[in-house]
Amino acid sequence: MIAHLRGTLLSKQPGQAIVECAGVGYDVAISVPTFTALPAEGAEVRLHIHTQVSEDAIALFGFLDREEKRLFERLITVSGVGPKLAIKMLSGLSPERTVAALRAQDHASLTRIPGVGKKLAERLVVELKDKLDDLIAAAPAAGPVAAGPAAEDVLSALLNLGYQRPAALKAIETAVEKDAAAGEDFDLLFRAALKLIR
C-alpha cells in the first residue's frame, strides 16, 4: 500500500493532482482544501496517501494535512460513504466545519453536500459524533456554517478562484455582517465577498 508520496507536482486542478516520483506519475484524488494549499506546478510536494484497492482499479487519495487524512478515513467507515463521497464532503465543508457539524448534529450543513441526503447525514452523526475527540478541533461557530446557506458555496467558489481560505472566510463573514440577507443568496454574497477580498 502507498502511504506517502514525495515528488514533483506535475499538474493540479480541483479534485486531482499528478505527482511524479522516480519517473512515475501518480494520479491522486484530492479535496478542495488540499488543492488550494498545494504549491505551484513544478514544485516538490509531499502528500499523505490513502490507497483504495478494488477489483479493477487502485485509487490514490492525497492530503497535505495528516488530520484531514484521518478524518477522511473515519468518514469512509460509515456505510454509504465511499472515498469519492468523502472527498466531496471535505470539499463542500472544510475538515474543521465537517467535525463541527458532526459534533453539533448539524444535519442541515451536511445535507448541503451533493450526495449526502437526510438519512446519510443522520447516520454520519450517529456513527461519528462520539469518535472525533482525537481529530481536528471543531471550528468556532462563526463562519460559513453559521453565515447562511450560500456561504459554503461562495467559499468553494472563492477557493477555486485561487483565494486563500482565511481571506475568503473573512470576506464572507464581513459581507454577512454588513447585510444578513446576503447569506441567503449566492450571487449577492459572492459579489459582496469578491469586492471585499480584493
Curated annotation (Swiss-Prot):
Primary residence: cytoplasm
Gene Ontology annotations of biological process type: DNA recombination; DNA repair
Single GO MF annotation: four-way junction helicase activity
Signal peptide stretch: none
Record-linked InterPro entries: DNA_helicase_Holl-junc_RuvA_I, Hlx-hairpin-Hlx_DNA-bd_motif, NA-bd_OB-fold, RuvA, RuvA_2-like, RuvA_C, RuvA_C_sf
CC annotations in GO: cytoplasm; Holliday junction helicase complex; Holliday junction resolvase complex
Pfam families, alphabetized: HHH_5 (PF14520), RuvA_C (PF07499), RuvA_N (PF01330)
Residue span of region Domain III: 146-198
Region (Flexible linker): 141-145
Keywords: Cytoplasm, DNA damage, DNA recombination, DNA repair, DNA-binding
Domain of life (superkingdom): Bacteria
Compartments, as annotated in UniProt: Cytoplasm
Region (Domain II): 65-141
Region Domain I, annotated ranges: 1-64
CDD domains registered for this protein in UniProt: UBA_RuvA_C
Quaternary structure and partners: Homotetramer. Forms an RuvA(8)-RuvB(12)-Holliday junction (HJ) complex. HJ DNA is sandwiched between 2 RuvA tetramers; dsDNA enters through RuvA and exits via RuvB. An RuvB hexamer assembles on each DNA strand where it exits the tetramer. Each RuvB hexamer is contacted by two RuvA subunits (via domain III) on 2 adjacent RuvB subunits; this complex drives branch migration. In the full resolvosome a probable DNA-RuvA(4)-RuvB(12)-RuvC(2) complex forms which resolves the HJ.
Function: The RuvA-RuvB-RuvC complex processes Holliday junction (HJ) DNA during genetic recombination and DNA repair, while the RuvA-RuvB complex plays an important role in the rescue of blocked DNA replication forks via replication fork reversal (RFR). RuvA specifically binds to HJ cruciform DNA, conferring on it an open structure. The RuvB hexamer acts as an ATP-dependent pump, pulling dsDNA into and through the RuvAB complex. HJ branch migration allows RuvC to scan DNA until it finds its consensus sequence, where it cleaves and resolves the cruciform DNA.
Family, as annotated: Belongs to the RuvA family.
HAMAP family listed in its UniProt record: DNA_HJ_migration_RuvA
Entry's free-text remark on domains: Has three domains with a flexible linker between the domains II and III and assumes an 'L' shape. Domain III is highly mobile and contacts RuvB.
NCBIfam families: ruvA
Name of this protein: Holliday junction branch migration complex subunit RuvA
Organism whose genome encodes this protein: Acidobacterium capsulatum (strain ATCC 51196 / DSM 11244 / BCRC 80197 / JCM 7670 / NBRC 15755 / NCIMB 13165 / 161)
Lineage: Bacteria, Pseudomonadati, Acidobacteriota, Terriglobia, Terriglobales
